[in-house]
């Protein structure tokens, strides 16, 4: 698999984080691991990318958090709000349209071989 270029993530991080939180609450490190494992390792994002995005989504009211104690350690667990569920549905609809259009265009082209 080719390494994921960071610029490809622009505009999609919010949707990815909302999708990872859809099944239920997760603490920050679990979110990072869910992104990595759910993408077969393609999305291995640093904490400096994920935590600020989680805080931004929380300020926007798309996710909320609660403190939990796990293994004797306090961790903040994030979960989707109703607005987050709605926004995720909207992101999915837009992604379906976008990816269909891009796939249609890219499959028509013959790309030059790269060395």
Explain the meaning of each model-derived region:
Residues 1-3, 78:
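A positively charged, amphipathic N-terminal helix/segment that binds anionic biomolecules
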Residues 3-7, 65-67:
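Short beta-strand/turn micro-motifs at beta-sheet edges
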Residues 5-49:
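N-terminal helix-turn-helix DNA-binding core of bacterial DNA-binding proteins
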Residues 50-57:
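Basic amphipathic alpha-helical segments that dock to polyanions
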Residues 58-74, 79:
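Beta-hairpin "wing" of winged helix-turn-helix
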Residues 73-92:
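Basic, amphipathic "hinge/linker" alpha-helix immediately C-terminal to the N-terminal HTH DNA-binding motif
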Residues 86-115:
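Amphipathic alpha-helical dimerization/coiled-coil segments
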């Amino acid at each position: 698999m080719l390494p994921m270029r960071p610029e490809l993530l622009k505009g999609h991080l919010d949707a990815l984080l909302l999708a990872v939180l859809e099944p239920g609450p997760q603490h920050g490190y679990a979110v990072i691991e869910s992104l990595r494992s759910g993408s077969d390792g393609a999305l291995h994002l640093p904490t400096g990318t994920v935590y600020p995005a989680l805080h931004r989504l929380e300020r926007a009211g798309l996710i909320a958090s609660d403190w939990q104690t796990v293994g004797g350690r306090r961790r903040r667990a994030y979960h989707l709000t109703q607005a987050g569920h709605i926004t995720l549905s909207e992101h999915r609809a837009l992604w379906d349209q976008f990816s269909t259009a891009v796939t249609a265009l890219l499959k028509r082209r013959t790309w030059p071989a790269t060395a």
